[in-house]
Amino acid sequence: NQKTILGHPSGLYVLFFTEMWERFSYYGMRAILVLFLVSSFTEGGWGWERSEALSLYALYTGLVYVTPIFGGLIADQILGYRNAIIIGALIMTLGHAAMALEVFYDFFLYVGLICLIIGNGLFKPNISSIVGKLYKTEGQDKDAGYTIFYMGINSGAFLGILLCGYIGENEGWHYGFGLAGIFMFLGMLQFYYAQNIFGSIGVFNKNNSKEKVVDESSGKDL
């Protein structure tokens, strides 16, 4: 029963911008991670060999695609979609902040990457799930809604790579990491304060969770 904007539920645009800023932070950080690791000490980097930097990058990227499996289960059984998104966004914000502080202590970079992996696992699968819940039936409207949502992903990725890359290379790598964190924080705040627009969508309900498990195991529509 949400109001519509351009034929779509108004909540879609909250998700659009939340996802856009999260993708800004994700791709912005990824764009400069390897460059930072291979840069010399005089340039503010760690002076790693290219193979070492790519190994860490590959490990991080691989784990980012694994943790959403667990994040989806946790949201279904314990947190609910909305709480999972907020907690995940907060953990990712702290992760970016930790990476920005690597200039003081090297281990902050690793702490930051771990936070990003965990936070992404909670955030990514559940924000996409809410998009689907906005529409009562399958059809062109739902397909178009996902298209709009993915436009936010692409826009955030483009802006993140552009701005974090520029700031990181020209002003300092930690500033690039910090900029990614700022926009992740903005995305989290936006979702947190606008979440009531979704009504009961994404709120954890123990009874509904049990029904969902029974439904999926039996193959019947409850």
Model-derived regions, located:
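Short amphipathic helix-loop junctions that connect adjacent transmembrane helices
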Residues: 31-54
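Central cavity-lining transmembrane alpha-helices of secondary-active solute carriers
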Residues: 54-76, 124, 158
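Glycine-rich segments within core transmembrane alpha-helices of 12-TM secondary carriers
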Residues: 64, 140-169, 176-187
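Primarily marks hydrophobic transmembrane alpha-helices of the MFS/SLC 12-helix fold
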Residues: 84-85
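C-terminal ends and interior cores of transmembrane alpha-helices
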Residues: 88-107
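Intracellular juxtamembrane helix-capping segments at the cytosolic ends
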Residues: 122-136
